[in-house]
């Protein structure tokens, strides 16, 4: 595919496990990618180079309005349009605390990125997408939010994370409703237990739970499992699908006796 035919995808949290794999998958399937993360550009130069010439890196914090604006401006300046937005960036509380000990500072930190930052970046991207021509399927762009099984599963040692992801599910529904007539499908993916840096600190706990049968498929999920799902929601494969939550968790959500 020539550069002039490539579609542009914006990916947040691009230097993390799911974000990086998502960028690789989109790049391998005809997209150019503009990605953002909090890592300084010189500190992730090797990883950025691994993604190739069709990748542009923007260092920034999703919680900051100016950084969100810079990300969108970079994508428009370099590619003239945004065909897909993949909201991957997310943080867990820096310290896991019982719900009765959770601090407002921790709550604000998690919500500021996971929910507020994603909501307002999506607003910026949607405003741009609305100005674009419809594709052969009648759509102007695609938006995918990476939520979590924690959106519907209680974990009282990280309540702020659960609330942030439950809120993100409503963000998905709101934008799906508002943008449907504009030809912009908005969906979310709810990963289960995925092998990333975020879960590495509790690997022993989840190894034990998986061995005991928590996940019917009997294994950890991988970032590639999520990236493939993202692609199907960005490339027109599911062009008539919006407001949906795609659960990718090896069956963990199934109620069993």
What are the residue ranges of the model-derived segments?
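Conserved glycine-rich cofactor-binding loop
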Residues: 15-16
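Substrate-binding pocket helix/loop in short-chain dehydrogenase/reductase
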Residues: 96-99, 103-108, 211
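Active-site helix of classical SDR
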Residues: 122, 164
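Alpha-helical segment proximal to the catalytic Tyr-Lys
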Residues: 127, 176-178, 239
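Residue(s) in the substrate-gating loop at a strand-loop-helix junction
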Residues: 148
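Short, small/polar-rich loop/turn modules that mediate ligand/substrate recognition or access, typified
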Residues: 180, 185, 241-243
């Amino acid at each position: 595919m020539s550069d002039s035919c490539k579609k542009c995808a914006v990916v947040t949290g691009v230097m993390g496990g799911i974000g990086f794999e998502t960028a690789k998958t989109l790049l391998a399937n005809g997209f150019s990618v503009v990605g953002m993360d909090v890592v300084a550009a010189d500190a992730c130069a090797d990883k950025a180079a691994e993604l190739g010439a069709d990748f542009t890196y923007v260092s920034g914090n999703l919680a900051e309005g100016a950084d969100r604006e810079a990300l969108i401006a970079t994508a428009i300046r370099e590619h003239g349009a945004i065909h897909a937005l993949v909201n991957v960036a997310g943080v867990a509380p820096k310290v896991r605390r019982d719900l009765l000990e959770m601090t407002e500072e921790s709550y604000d930190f998690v919500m500021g990125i996971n929910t507020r930052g994603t909501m307002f970046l999506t607003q910026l991207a949607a405003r741009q997408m609305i100005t674009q021509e419809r594709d052969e399927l009648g759509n102007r762009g695609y938006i995918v939010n990476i939520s979590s099984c924690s959106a519907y599963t209680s974990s009282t040692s990280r309540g702020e994370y659960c609330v942030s992801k439950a809120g993100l599910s409503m963000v998905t529904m709101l934008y799906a409703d508002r943008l449907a007539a504009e030809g912009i499908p908005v969906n979310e993916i709810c990963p289960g237990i995925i092998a990333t840096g975020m879960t590495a600190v509790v690997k022993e706990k989840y190894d034990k739970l998986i061995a005991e049968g928590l996940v019917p498929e009997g294994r950890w999920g991988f970032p590639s499992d999520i990236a493939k799902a993202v692609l199907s929601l960005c490339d027109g494969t599911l062009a008539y699908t919006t407001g949906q939550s795609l659960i990718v968790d090896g069956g963990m959500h199934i109620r069993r006796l």
